[in-house]
Amino acid sequence: GVRAITAARRVVVTDEDLFPAGVLSLHGKEKNEPSAALGTVELNGLKVYDQEIGEALAYAEALCRAAGSQLTPLLLQLMDGQVSFRYDAHDLHYYEDGGIDCTVRGATVAMGSAYFMKKRRIALPRDLKMETGVFMTVDGRLAAIFAVKYLPSRNVEWALRALRRNRVTPVLATRGVNITPNLLKRKFRLNARPIYPGVATRLALADLTAQPGETPNALIYRDGLLPMAETV
């Protein structure tokens, strides 16, 4: 086990490793919330275009649930008590340029980064200043903008530094359309030099991390990237 661990030069890292969910926050930290319970992904607001807000949220939740997105519990919190219906997504497709689309009740619903939308020639507001916004279209028309914010965790920063110091390369198995090497560099103020495979490889690796593997080489008693970094 020790030999296998010390020989490891790469480690698969998921969305949850980089930005632990904890208690996901809709509008940031509330005064009476303990800091330890806060997550590192926030939904700070949304703007809806030419859609009923309930309909837009139902479309977004259906796609995010099918994609295994970290935004799903945030959207469910937002819908709780306001939107009584749920939709299901079919024919999910992922794209290399940072987006996903699917079919929901016969409509083509797409969600992705600003870059993804520009590649699809979707007109976005000119005064928009959101590095990690998530945009949604329905049948090719802008339907909603979600202000998503990623908050860097000190433990994750330490873990990334430990991996680099020990010459272990992170392999990103991320589903989030905005979780890229550039985002990590901005948020954690270091170049972790991760490997960023194509979308099909990232999804396959993410699925593998959720499955039981072969004979374990170590037991890790705490969740998160830092205990794993300390082990390898």
Give the residues covered by each predicted segment.
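Flexible loop/N-cap segments at domain edges
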Residues: 140
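Conserved ATP-binding TGD loop and adjacent catalytic N/P-domain core of P-type ATPases
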Residues: 106, 143-232
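A generic structural motif
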Residues: 26, 115, 149-150
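ATP-binding glycine-rich phosphate-binding loop
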Residues: 91-101, 115, 127-128
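Conserved catalytic phosphorylation-site environment of P-type ATPases
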Residues: 1-59
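ATP-binding catalytic core of ATPases
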Residues: 33-96, 180-182
